[in-house]
Amino acid sequence: MAVLLDELEWSREQPLALPDPADRRLGRICQALLEDPADPRGLEEWARCVGASSRTLARLFLSELGVTFVHWRHQVRLAAALPRLAAGEAVARIAVDLGYQTPSAFSAMFRRLTGSTPSRYFALSDSA
């Protein structure tokens, strides 16, 4: 149990990695998602918007940002959610605002990225 708590503490201390891409097409996508994390467009739609193939964009996300498009979008949404959760906003409201179909889908993403549910993450922070 102590090892698990240490892992959770370490993950809370790590900054979210949202590097800026050099490629202008990726830059347009990343900026749009930072401005509106709930934007539902997938890689195919973004490819049409920026004049590239979805395969090219997928390769660029991996080579320039080190993560897939989906993972990067989850990180953006997590970064948008954390201050709101810390302020005590309801998980259901945040989930809807960030484009998740259900609060449980948001909680599942949160758990994958942080190792904890939203409510437990902040409860552990407060008790540490």
Predicted regions and their residues:
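Regulatory input/activation interfaces that engage signals or partners
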Residues: T114
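Short hydrophobic/aromatic patch on the recognition helix
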Residues: L57, F61, A105-F106, F110
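Short, basic interhelical loop/turn and adjoining N-cap
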Residues: C49-T56, G99-A105
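Terminal helix-turn-helix DNA-binding modules in bacterial transcription factors
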Residues: P40, E44, S63-P103, A123-A128
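Short Gly/charged-rich anion-binding patches and loops
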Residues: R28, T56, A90
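Short, Lys/Arg-enriched, Trp-marked, Pro/Gly-tolerant hinge/linker segments that flank
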Residues: M1-V50, S63-H71, Q75
